Regions:
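Internal, active-site/partner-interface "lid" segment
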Residues: 43, 73-100
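Generic signature of intrinsically disordered, low-complexity segments enriched in small/polar residues
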Residues: 62, 66, 89, 108-109
Length: 112
């Protein structure tokens, strides 16, 4: 996916662990901006039967991503720009706000 985005001229950001090498290379080496979460390979911590899941790299990467999004939103507000924040459906009025955002950005962002 990163290579496809780069080929299309999109600036890429990767959050990964340098300890794990997949697909014959290191994702962090190919991204324009690379953030190493520093989690060692084999980081699954929850045993489910004979398997392990719940990799700490996932938690670390999502923490990093959310921190970036929060700081970006704060900086936008400080500059007088209201960022389009998708709201939890568990928050009162969240669903209505999200529908308005989906209508505004229809065609640009596909619904999951």
């Amino acid at each position: 996916m990163l290579r496809t985005a780069k080929a299309a001229g999109v600036k890429t950001v990767a959050i990964s662990s340098s300890a794990y090498k997949a697909h014959g290379g290191v994702l962090l080496d190919e991204a324009d901006i690379a953030i190493d979460c520093k989690v060692p390979h084999g980081d699954a911590v929850i045993e489910v039967g004979a398997a392990k899941m719940g990799g700490l790299s996932t938690y670390a990467s999502m923490f990093i991503l959310n921190s970036i999004l929060i700081e970006g939103a704060k900086k936008a507000l400080a500059r007088g720009v209201t960022p389009p924040i998708y709201t939890s459906g568990n928050v009162e009025g969240g669903t209505a706000k999200n529908i308005a955002l989906e209508e505004r950005y229809f065609g640009r962002v596909r619904r999951l």
